[in-house]
């Protein structure tokens, strides 16, 4: 099974999260892990189905959230601000609702608008594949679709850490493009 090594890698990284100094909610992945492919129906800011492969070539932040998640009320507006900050860069934000009832996700989005694509995983299959363990959970992917960081939970200031990580990946991307020429 192709996903088995990926799942074991993520499970290996999660204990590092609990050991992070000062309650830091970010786990850096030293050896980038290819993210599993998925396809889910869009419910906001996109039409039809979206797949991870739609975002290849862009740094992508995949954010798992739910309507019952308290910290998601802070994280989604913060991610909107980052989406605006990086609008001119090859950066994409994507929200994946894990609500079982689609109407719950819609009600939440009416109160906490999101400016980037939102898809829904009512069966929880993709969340299980990513080994999501806590809400919200975010996965920062490089342009090749590899997981570079795992973010678990959200508190004020986490968006600043995420912005720095995105800038670092943008710099790496620019450097690799120069090296290829």
Language model: regions and residue ranges:
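Conserved redox-active cysteine motifs that mediate thiol-disulfide chemistry
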Residues: 64-81
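Thiol-based oxidoreductase modules, predominantly thioredoxin-like and allied folds used
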Residues: 90-103, 114-123
């Amino acid at each position: 099974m192709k996903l088995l090594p990926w799942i074991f890698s993520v499970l290996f990284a999660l204990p590092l999260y609990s050991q992070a100094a000062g309650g830091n909610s970010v786990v850096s992945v030293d050896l980038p892990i290819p993210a599993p492919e998925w396809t889910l129906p869009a419910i906001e800011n996109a039409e039809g189905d979206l797949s991870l492969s739609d975002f290849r070539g862009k740094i992508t932040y995949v954010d798992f959230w739910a309507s019952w998640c308290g910290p998601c009320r802070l994280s989604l507006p913060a991610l909107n601000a980052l989406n605006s900050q990086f609008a001119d860069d090859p950066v994409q934000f994507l929200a994946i609702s894990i609500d079982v009832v689609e109407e719950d996700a819609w009600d939440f989005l009416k109160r906490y608008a999101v400016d980037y694509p939102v898809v829904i995983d009512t069966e929880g299959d993709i969340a299980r594949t990513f080994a999501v363990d806590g809400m919200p959970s975010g996965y920062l992917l490089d342009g090749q679709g590899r997981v570079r960081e795992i973010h678990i939970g959200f508190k004020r200031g986490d968006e600043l850490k995420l912005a720095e990580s995105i800038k670092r990946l943008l710099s790496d991307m620019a450097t690799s493009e120069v090296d290829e020429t």
